[in-house]
Amino acid sequence: MPRAAILDVDGTLVDSNDAHAQAWVTAFNEAGIDVSYDRVRRAIGMGGDKLLPHVSGLSAESQVGRRVSARRGEIFRSDFLPHLNGFPRVRELVQQLLADGYRVVVASSAESQELDPLLEIAGITDLLQARASSNDANRSKPDPDIVVAALNRSGAERSQAIMLGDTPYDVEAALAAGIEIVGVETGGWGPDDLRGAAEVHTGVAELCAHYPDSIFARLAAASSLP
């Protein structure tokens, strides 16, 4: 029976959440809309279609909303994306998951044109079995559609899948999809914010250090029993 490790990207594998927030704030400011950085930062991890009305009251389908969203993408890709870094030991974690028989799939609210370079930055493009982005779902996080799309592409049952994410929106999406999730604090949220996660680690590096005791290792061991 296949097992799946479903990985979020922004804030989990790549240190990009602050950059996303600043790109949104700049785009809002250019449109004459006053939205604080802190308000936007706490919404990073939602899909852009949900973040936009959440922080500004603008409909994502409105003319202004579409303009702000498009400009945010331009700013992020030109001003921030070239300078981002992956978190330590990301490739090592994915290699360990593969060695334990997991099919590794990413589930990200990013659009494909941003997801591809982010995966290059994380250093795992060649290791992935599949991916699901906002282009593959009707509803973005915290709705479960992207996670379900990733799960379906993995071929695993819900009981054989674990997600890794950094925001409360990842936790909500995973639980709504019926799978367990491991949280990391590198996105800016702590254990209280990630309540509902089976485990919370300071980051991928700590998860790697404690991998033999993790839920990933336990599921792999249990699934290997005759």
Model regions and ranges:
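Asp-based, Mg2+/Mn2+-dependent phosphohydrolase catalytic module
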Residues: 1-3, 95-98, 111-226
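N-terminal helical cap/lid subdomain that shapes the substrate entry/recognition surface
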Residues: 2-91, 95-102
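Conserved phosphate-coupling serine/threonine residues in phosphotransfer and NTP-handling enzymes
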Residues: 12, 108-110
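Residue-level marker of regulatory loop/turn positions in helix-turn-helix DNA-binding domains and
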Residues: 86, 107, 139
